[in-house]
């Protein structure tokens, strides 16, 4: 699949490459879309001649960096968008949905997969679990914020507290499962790649709304043409295939 996607991206970039010289393009994005972007950057660089300097972090942390005025040619943020557009740091008209990503449940490889088909089934699974791990929402992790809201909606947030092992990032949560330190793990589906775990599935939409990720062009982009090339690439039909491969839904 990777070869196919890369070929499509190379063709798209060859058609859409700008006439300007090579430039460095800076990008900032949350961890939920990190792996998809990292997968695509080499093909963009080869085909466009530009280079990309990418910064990744928590959903809240990266958004705050943009809001405070740090300049990244292509910022990728999660809603609400009004907080970002009100700062004047981004071109409001450039707002484009790139992808959405859902919170998923994972277990250690070879372990039974619990039923998560309904809200009641998820509640039963969580109450029966001895330990769970997921990214720390208090530190800005969007997956953690989302799952905290799910537990509150289910009415079990306080009851679950003694069982929770909060970590920094989805990869750490998956590693804890693979090592047998916790029974269940949750993070964005796009972050589950550890060979020691297996995906059970995504949480039902009735208790967990997928997180949307929007791209912008910064008002102070160092090379507007190069920024536009990367921005258009990340929202292209070819890139949509990469998002799907990584467990995300394309924004358009």
Residue ranges and their predicted role:
Residues 1-5:
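Positively charged n-region of N-terminal signal peptides that target proteins for export
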Residues 6-16:
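Bacterial N-terminal signal peptides
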């Amino acid at each position: 699949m990777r070869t196919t996607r890369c070929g499509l991206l190379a063709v798209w970039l060859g058609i859409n490459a700008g006439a300007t010289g090579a430039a460095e393009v800076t990008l900032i994005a949350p961890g939920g879309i990190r792996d998809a972007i990292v997968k695509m950057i080499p093909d963009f660089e080869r085909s466009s001649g530009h280079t990309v300097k990418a910064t990744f972090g928590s959903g809240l942390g990266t958004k705050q960096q943009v809001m405070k005025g740090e300049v990244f040619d292509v910022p990728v943020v999660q809603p609400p968008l009004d907080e970002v557009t009100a700062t004047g740091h981004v071109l409001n008209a450039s707002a484009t949905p790139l992808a959405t990503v859902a919170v998923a449940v994972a277990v250690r490889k070879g372990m039974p997969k619990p039923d998560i088909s309904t809200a009641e089934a998820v509640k039963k699974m969580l109450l029966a679990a001895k330990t769970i791990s997921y990214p720390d929402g208090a530190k800005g992790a969007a997956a953690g914020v989302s799952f905290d809201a799910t537990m509150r909606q289910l009415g079990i947030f306080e009851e679950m507290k003694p069982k929770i092992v909060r970590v920094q990032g989805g990869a750490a949560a998956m590693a804890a499962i693979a090592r047998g330190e916790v029974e269940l793990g949750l993070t964005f589906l796009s972050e589950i790649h550890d060979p020691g775990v297996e995906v059970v599935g995504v949480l039902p939409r009735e208790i967990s709304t997928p997180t949307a990720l929007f791209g912008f062009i910064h008002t102070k982009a160092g090379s507007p043409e190069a920024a536009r090339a990367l921005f258009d690439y990340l929202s292209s039909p070819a890139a949509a295939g990469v998002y799907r491969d990584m467990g995300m839904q394309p924004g358009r």
